[in-house]
């Protein structure tokens, strides 16, 4: 394990933690730094005409970062390193350059063959123009029923080809999902075409067209649209919805210092990159003046969307939306009051396009607070529930939304007042669709969601990457299962047969740590520090991973998607921490064959017996949903949530939210006093009051009606 400095957390308040600078080594590259990186590369290689695929921060080694953070000396501050992925026409593979921005020099450039770069917006937009002009594509459109003079009504969603043995990974290839619109505002997904062009991205031409053995002509049904004008034309009007306003008259409860945010005892760094999108680092909790580290880094590191139709070419449909396109590159500029509601703080994102120019996504990250419902409550039945305490919570939400062709992914990192950290993903957008004939047997691989529209079965599997730092660098993972107690009913040890307990298993090695969710045992995973025990329970301090939306990868072992997305074969993997091991499907995902599998399975195979007990570890968790489409998902899918929790267990002495002011608190002695003064009726009415803005739905405000009343 790398040497890390001693953690001084337990002796400092947040405001005095070292590293409280406005500029931090984990900050994303600024617009000026991106420009500088491009200038340095061009200066070093003036005769080259590179296309810039990626320019991003190379995060400093963990040990170096922590040494700087706790040394209080800027002399130890890690240098700013930019990682650039460059493309050169006629040169296979990619060029990977490392640029020292602090010293303004290229420190390394490496030519890597046998890999393909991420697909950028520049590449994708170009593809649609290429297919529209291709004679063979025009011919197939006409055969499908598209009028010859309406090629400008033909659209495509360009995807990476996934993997196709005809092309391997020596050329950068795309496949085009084809559609038709009768006008530019139509939803193309209600009129899919049945053929799939293959495009050589480098030569910018169509090299083949995959044509099904059974043709499916263009549907003559009207488009199924969802814009307001279309719904009003169909229904006559939109439904009446009275607005809900969110106000914070005293301002927000968080404060920003550079890219660091402090909120209700939490403190963390908010990063962002082209691939993972939001990255949260250096997460700690102020436990009554003791600053306790929780996680060094957390992110959604990869995802895969495998489709379930085995017919060619649909086996290629298993998008790695992060590794092949990038959640950062695909991120939306967020709109006030629409994507986020309330009192908002935004962070922009900066990227470099293929010509080396800096582009900015305004409002890429939304930071705001939401009402979190009842935080805790208890009432006493002895006085008809008049003795009561009830507190309402708020929650901090750090979010982004990215669009991957037809789908939208809404990513929410949510922090609760009781110390819980939640990751919520919401899936919306439009189903990927394919043409079908009237009355066609879909063989169970899909559902007709609209006349002649086939939506294939698919999954959305995400990989959460956690590098814990719970009260120190040496952590373990315990698999916790609920089990029935020993002994049958009537036995001495379990006479009534009702006994149950937990079975706690701590894997020692990487190989032993591979496991899956078990709903029968309510399985959870305690990420813990075995060196620090709770003074009451005697159990290790921990954060429990609670995740129940964990479908297995439906594709069979040995399938193309199983080989390429090896991280998705199991729900939990644990590996020793190593700098640079971030992406579980490998650094370069497009057009990998899966033979051998890159990323996480590769690292596990290298060191299957490496220790993951009481050391610096990374926890990889695959979760998601299996989606069998239905007509209610079309033409625009209602948002479907997926949630998981990181819940403190044996971490705090007691409920850490008890210092949140209650909305209502009446003690037994106060009830007795009110009874003595004849004010019980007024007390009962007071139980409805939570704040000055609350009111009755069909009457006047309570606080106005009883203004001046004295309750005790």
UniProtKB/Swiss-Prot annotation:
Primary enzyme class: oxidoreductase
Cofactor binding summary note: Binds 1 copper ion per subunit. Can also use zinc ion as cofactor.
One Gene Ontology cellular component: ascospore-type prospore
GO biological process per UniProt: amine catabolic process; amine metabolic process; cellular detoxification; intracellular copper ion homeostasis
Residues that bear 2',4',5'-topaquinone: 407
Binding site for Cu cation: 458, 460, 627
Family: Belongs to the copper/topaquinone oxidase family.
Required cofactor(s): Cu cation; Zn(2+); L-topaquinone; Mn(2+)
Keyword list, A-Z: Copper, Cytoplasm, Disulfide bond, Manganese, Metal-binding, Oxidoreductase, TPQ
InterPro entries hit by this protein: Cu_Am_Ox_Cu-bd, Cu_Am_ox_TPQ-bd, Cu_amine_oxidase, Cu_amine_oxidase_C, Cu_amine_oxidase_C_sf, Cu_amine_oxidase_N-reg, Cu_amine_oxidase_N2, Cu_amine_oxidase_N3
Protein name, per record: Copper amine oxidase 1
